[in-house]
Amino acid sequence: MRGFILALVLALVGAQKHDLEPVFSTGKTYLYDYKGLILHGLPGKGLAAAGLKLTCRLEISRVSRSDHLLQIENVFKVANKTRHHKKWIHSRVKAAVTDLWEEPSATPLSSSSSTDSSAEGEEPGNKRDKDEIWQFGKKYGADSSSSSSSSSTGSGSSKTCSSSREDSSRDKHCSVDSEYFNQQADLPIYQFWFKPADEQDPRRKVQNSSISSSSSSSSDEGISTPVSQPMFLGDSKPPVLAAVLRAIRRNEQPTGYQLVLYTDRQASRLRVQVFVSSITESDRWKLCADASVVNSHKASGTLKWGKDCQDYQVATQIATGQFAAHPAIQVKLEWSEVPSSVRKTAR
């Protein structure tokens, strides 16, 4: 610290006399600016600790003012030259990579950079390398630009593809997507409908139309029931099965359920009706099920329950046929209202 203060005082005195007095300090390196002040005084480290790219130590003992300024100028010139040289190497490589994909009309290097490099002692081989890099970039840059322009114009889509190296992968996807879009646009559109098996045979179609109402599984008119069949088989048929489930409690009315089954079998048709009702006089809850087989390819059924079988209703129809060239089964369901518990179970 004392040596630093002593050097500062001597520098100020030397600046006034236009001559610098010798500064002696063990293990220290001093650098004076043009005013005679101490710019750096770092013990044992010299100018390298101040950010200057020098490997030698600089010790100033007794120099004149003109020599002092000349030395400082040379020091900063050497330091700036080192940093500029490294930056120029980085920029040269970066420019070489960029020039590979730029237009060939761009100038490879400016005149100022070439003069600076020659003044800084550039070797003759570096110039030859730059020329080779430029020729390489000129060749492949032209090829890439021509190929990208041909691919963008030949795709036939409204999407344009750039010719930069960063977007080269995206350009490939662009061309692939355009080709795929064109291929998909040329594909035909097919519409397949379910064809019931009973409608494919004209004789069977006429037979079915004579015994049932016009109901087609491929239409959206809904599920219909045969008009020729009676609504209640008990009007013309005796029950096939009757069962009663009864529970009796003390001092209470008997409770239970009654089940009645009716069937009607004909040549190619079968109809079944099931009725379940409560035996309690005050309870009017009933369940009514009606299922019929129209032919060997179609069956339908309805299920009603609630008060006098009028609260809830579900209708279904099952038909076999073909979908395109494959055998298939079509199932239709219709309901007006169902309990919330049934909806939760279905979900």
Swiss-Prot record:
Record flagged with keyword Glycoprotein: yes
Parts forming coiled coils: none
InterPro entries cross-referenced by the UniProt entry: Lipid_transp_b-sht_shell (IPR015819), Vitellinogen_b-sht_N (IPR015816), Vitellinogen_b-sht_shell (IPR015258), Vitellinogen_b-sht_shell_sf (IPR037088), Vitellogenin/Apolipophorin (IPR050733), Vitellogenin_N (IPR001747)
Record keywords, A-Z: Disulfide bond, Glycoprotein, Phosphoprotein, Signal, Storage protein
Stretch list, region Disordered: 104-174, 200-234
Tissue-by-tissue expression: Produced by the liver, secreted into the blood and then sequestered by receptor mediated endocytosis into growing oocytes, where it is generally cleaved, giving rise to the respective yolk components.
Carbohydrate-modified residues: 80, 208
MF terms in GO: lipid transporter activity; nutrient reservoir activity
The protein's role, per its UniProt record: Precursor of the egg-yolk proteins that are sources of nutrients during early development of oviparous organisms.
Name the UniProt record assigns to this protein: Vitellogenin-3
Organism: Gallus gallus
